[in-house]
Swiss-Prot record:
GO terms, molecular function: large ribosomal subunit rRNA binding; structural constituent of ribosome
HAMAP family: Ribosomal_uL14
Record-linked NCBIfam families: rplN_bact
Signal peptide: none
PROSITE patterns for the chain: RIBOSOMAL_L14
Complexes and interactors: Part of the 50S ribosomal subunit. Forms a cluster with proteins L3 and L19. In the 70S ribosome, L14 and L19 interact and together make contacts with the 16S rRNA in bridges B5 and B8.
Family the UniProt entry places it in: Belongs to the universal ribosomal protein uL14 family.
Job description of the protein: Binds to 23S rRNA. Forms part of two intersubunit bridges in the 70S ribosome.
Keywords: Ribonucleoprotein, Ribosomal protein, RNA-binding, rRNA-binding
Origin: domain of life: Bacteria
Record's protein name: Large ribosomal subunit protein uL14
GO cellular component: cytosolic large ribosomal subunit
């Protein structure tokens, strides 16, 4: 579960390394974001010559959480870290690669590109 002020890792090659959640989108009183939710983030750490720079405010979709996701068969898939993939204002991916595993629950019309770019889909 990601909330405001949470520091999370970036799982793409956009140039950002760590970002901070500044807003969970989807309602005025919404507090937590789970896998597949869109959040507003601020870049806190970035590499030189990347596509984004420190201080940029962007959208991001949550692809991994330590809380995990519960499947219909009762299984729970958890990860070692919280990670997001950066999006632009039109909710298109900024990077061209996705690192680490992602879950099948991202398989919606909006985020099918993340599934196709990911090396491992659980």
């Amino acid at each position: 579960m990601i909330q405001t002020q949470s520091i999370v890792d970036v799982a793409d090659n956009s140039g950002a390394r760590r970002v901070m959640c500044i807003k969970v989108l989807g309602g005025s009183k919404r507090r937590y974001a789970n896998i597949g939710d869109v959040i507003k983030v601020s870049i806190k750490e970035a590499i030189p010559r990347g596509k984004v720079k420190k201080g940029d405010v962007m959208h991001a979709v949550v692809v991994r959480t330590r809380k995990g996701v519960r499947r219909n068969d009762g299984s729970l898939i958890r990860f070692d870290n919280n990670a997001v993939v950066l999006l632009n204002n039109q909710l298109q991916l900024v990077g061209t690669r996705v690192f680490g595993p992602v879950v099948r629950e991202l398989r919606t019309d909006k985020f099918m590109k993340i599934i196709s770019l990911a090396l491992e889909v659980l």
